[in-house]
Amino acid sequence: MTETATDGHVVSIRDLWMSFPGKSAGQQIHVLERIDLQVTAGEFVCIVGPSGCGKSTLLNIVGGFLCQTRGEALVEGQPVSGPDPRRIFVFQENGVFPWLTVRENIGFGLGQKSPEKREKTVAHYTEMVGLNGFEAAYPRELSGGMRQRVEIARALAANPDIIYMDEPFGALDFITRLKMRSDLTRIWQAEKKTILFVTHDIEEAVQLADRVLVMSKRPATIQEVVVIDLPRPRDLDSHGYLERRDHIFRAMGMSVRIGESAT
């Protein structure tokens, strides 16, 4: 029976498997197995796991860029059949248009609005991401963090139902990543968009998410779901934060002490 969006799950994945053809004839590389996942409207969910385990593959299936080998992927109650403008991707790679200004990048895709509404929308999200005064700047004149703010503002301006984020801060330096996490938390609290966020950074996941999905090695399953029931903004020195962070490290077979393995 097909689940509807009224059940509260805007993303519903059931018994999903994914394989890719190998180099040899008939060879199959099994990436995902028995994936079950539900995401509620307005929820912030992070996905972590070993490098190459299939985190981005799962996100691309939900986003409509890949089709699963078997199983069911529903978004807003309908089978995923391809990319949808109501669902926006934000990638690690710089996705802003270098030939457009900040204002033009944020307003890209708003052609259906009247000039007045488009200008108001662009101004609102320019302010929200802290880019006032840079409206006429081109991407080459901005830092990496500022370019990511442009991309986030452009995604929000389109008023999507869901935002998929694939390691959007992975290429930024540590201090800028911390600032971007804080900014994204503030923006999410204001907008309450559904966000599905892939990251290799466990601390980032615990700082941002309502729930963290911990994936196993390939062929990956969701081996654990960790609820992060901590107030925002998160205190990175608090017992609750450190406890959940360390729990996820151990779930992935890692120690928080460099050079040690979890037992």
Predicted segments, located by residue:
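Helix-to-loop junction immediately C-terminal to a conserved catalytic motif
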Residues: 63
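Conserved ABC ATPase "signature" region
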Residues: 116-134, 186
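A short, proline-enriched helix->beta-strand linker immediately N-terminal to the Walker B motif
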Residues: 157-161
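Short coil-to-helix segment of the ABC ATPase nucleotide-binding domain corresponding to the Q-loop/switch region
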Residues: 100-107
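Conserved ABC ATPase signature
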Residues: 138-142, 146
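The feature captures the beta-strand-to-loop junction immediately N-terminal to the Walker
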Residues: 48-50
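Conserved ABC transporter NBD signature motif
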Residues: 71-83
